[in-house]
Amino acid sequence: MPDRTGPLLRTPAWRALEAHLAELQPLHLRELFARDPGRGERLVADGAGLHLDYSKQRVTEETVRLLAALAEARGLPERRAAMFRGEKVNVTEGRAVLHVALRAPRGERILVDGSDVVPEVHAVLDRMAAFADQVRSGAWTGFTGKRIRTVVNVGIGGSDLGPAMAYRALRAYATRDLAFRFVSNVDGTDLAEAVRDLDPAETLFLVASKTFTTLETMTNAASARSWLLAALGDPRAVARHFVAISTNEAEVRRFGIDPANMFGFWDWVGGRYSMDSAIGLSTMIAVGPEGFRELLAGFREMDEHFRDAPLERNLPALIGLLGVWNANLLGAETVAVLPYDQYLDRFPAYLQQLTMESNGKRVTASGAPVEGHGTGAIYWGEPGTNGQHSFYQLLHQGTHLVACDFIGFCRPLHALARHHDLLMANLFAQGEALAFGKTAEEARAEGTPEPLVPHRTFPGNRPSSTILADRLTPRTLGALVALYEHAVFTQGVIWDVDSFDQWGVELGKVLANRIVKELESPAEPALAHDGSTNALIRRYRARRGG
């Protein structure tokens, strides 16, 4: 039986990995390639249009075999099947986890509590498509009869990061008849700058909040409504300029939005897994229903690859297991996501929520403390080549071991071919430099003065993977996002954490609700926080002005 819920470090599969590490750790990547020149052609895997080269990871084929054995021992195949079947694998909230149903084809059956959810998914997609076509064609007009020119998505977390990332990633495919802006921060600057130069009569707001009570989103939505009504006057204008992505019809109606323009989703879709649900309405308006269907097809193709491919050739499983190897055995606590494509400039930020909110847990799914190992690596990054002139110094010569995921495309979406060759040359060069470095002898052979030799030496042996695709398309983006979704799931199974809850965000919300009343109190409030927080509140109240 799989040893899924016992302490990870006590499992025979983990101990086998530790013994293997003792043999492998003394070997530099230079030595691994010297012993096995063909590893660059063998330590690769392909799926859903993506090519993964992990030969510059500090692993061998035996490492991958042992990692796959660990996944088997922790019950990954069984947990994966349970998720696809619609079982309640989000144990702390008692919910199914079925983002895979959002991209299931018509006719497939996926049951939640005995009910097939696929027809519901496609009913929403069909309504989204009809609405998107209306906005794109100009058939949907504002209250004064003007055509919509700007779409503003108002959300936070998964209701913002996914749509904002997808729009920036797919700008090459987006209609040029519409502009798109995204508001998430409760900081009024975000909304003020988003609407600064807009004509209210030509602006459509998409308000994304499942409950329609999310503090940040509804604060921004209320201010946006005030901005609109200050210009258009008539409260009936709200129904032509606001659309809801929500399941709370009563609150939607109270806000002034026609429930006919409410697009729902389900409690089996977590926010950070929702960009291909109704939360993606802004994406569909931008790239059109056909482009959105291509996005879903890419998700689906990777879903099927994750479900069916052997673990040792399974891209999401490999990404997830290599992450466990790097974090828990090699000590690389952070992952730099380095897309060599400017269109993916928000992809690292998107992955921050997907990975860190999912697996940043200190207790197991059953509530026991995680024993003796970390969970949830820290994800960060910037597009190449910007990062090379920022933080790559630390990657190459710093004291922290950082695992890197390079992402690149063989064909650009522009006609500046030499630019792309230079870009990709840098991608390949960085992976090579991180892996092999430069020895003191090589530095001296180049004529480096002896006092500078230590400064011109690169240790190498820094692990990285490279993900290549032919071109960035909606389909490729869907596959890329699903790759990391399922990698996160894989890691959650290994660590035995619930990757689909986020209780850690709750305490700050509760305290903020208490503090805002103290900030807004006309009389001096009786503060009962710690001394630091009390002093900060008093200083703010004294200095904020009128």
From Swiss-Prot:
One Gene Ontology cellular component annotation held by this UniProt entry: cytosol
Pathway note: Carbohydrate biosynthesis; gluconeogenesis; Carbohydrate degradation; glycolysis; D-glyceraldehyde 3-phosphate and glycerone phosphate from D-glucose: step 2/4
Top-rank lineage group of the source organism: Bacteria
Record EC number: 5.3.1.9
Active-site residues from the entry: E357 (proton donor), H389, K509
HAMAP family named among the record's database cross-references: G6P_isomerase
Family, similarity comment: Belongs to the GPI family.
Function summary: Catalyzes the reversible isomerization of glucose-6-phosphate to fructose-6-phosphate.
Protein name: Glucose-6-phosphate isomerase
Biological source species: Anaeromyxobacter sp. (strain K)
Lineage: Bacteria, Pseudomonadati, Myxococcota, Myxococcia, Myxococcales
